[in-house]
Amino acid sequence: MTPHDEQITALLTQLDQALGSPATTHGLARTLRAAVKEVELHRHHRASVADLSDGVLKPSPTKIQIGGGGHRIEGFLNIDIVPPADLLWDVREGIPLADDSTQEVFSEHFLEHIDYPRSAKHYAHEAHRVLAPGGQLITGVPDAAYVLSQYPAPPEQATEMIERWYAKRECRSDINTYLDLINYVFRDQDDDPTYNPHYWAYDHGKLVQLFCEAGFKTVEPWTFDPTMANPKRRWASVYVIATK
Ligand SMILES: C[S@@+](CC[C@H](N)C(=O)[O-])C[C@H]1O[C@@H](n2cnc3c(N)ncnc32)[C@H](O)[C@@H]1O
């Protein structure tokens, strides 16, 4: 174990002890839980870094999915920071592929979960770097433009949208009005540590700007393909396909 890994292990022990103390207040506990989660992600990532000689996957996969969670796609190498991915990797640190080495990068409902601008812009540049010329980046996110366009929504419509997105979440009982729904699209911050917050909201125009800035030649709307994308994401999401 390296000195850094020893430090991280000691830190985790300290965080657990502080969290277990009755003196720890609600605000401090929230921050400590977030820190524990980051430490655990960091450990997954460090273990994968140690397994990769030269820091890149060899041979390079033809297609990769980023942040697929439980939605694995056949024929793709599935990269996520938590299981059941093929590679546990923190994409905020880059994409571990060689330059110009892959044909397709797919993600949906992932981009809004990494901080903007640093990590979102880094991701766009990394996707551009690893794609071969002509390669394609497909990206789907919750469509903030759609959600905002419905405001102010009548209570029945608000209830329908809330049910579609949050029926299975523990937070469901706290999402009561349309403005609560808008808050969630922009800042999804469940106290449940298994959820990643939303850090930034996107629409078609923002995706075009982000990927053009990263060097992609064209960014067009992508026609939803349920053989690849998660069918539950079809509603109220916006997808684009960017070509290098
Ligand atoms: C809301 S889920 C979406 C899962 C799937 N794409 C879908 O549409 O059902 C977001 C996913 O992004 C992953 N994720 C978040 N931050 C990440 C990071 N820094 N590196 C890799 N994956 C990350 C999470 O672990 C999670 O699986």
Where would I find each of the regions flagged by the language model?
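Membrane-proximal basic amphipathic "stem/tether" segments
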Residues: 1-58
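Short low-complexity stretches enriched in small and charged residues
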Residues: 30-42, 58-66, 95-96, 196-200
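A structural signal for well-ordered alpha-helical scaffolds and beta->alpha junctions
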Residues: 45-49, 63, 204
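Short charge-dense sequence patches
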Residues: 50-59, 76-81, 149-165
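A short catalytic or substrate-binding loop motif that flags glycine-/basic-rich loops and adjacent residues
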Residues: 57-58, 69, 232-235
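Conserved SAM-binding loop
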Residues: 61-149, 205, 240-244
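S-adenosyl-L-methionine-dependent methyltransferase catalytic module, highlighting the catalytic core
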Residues: 118-122, 126, 132, 136-243
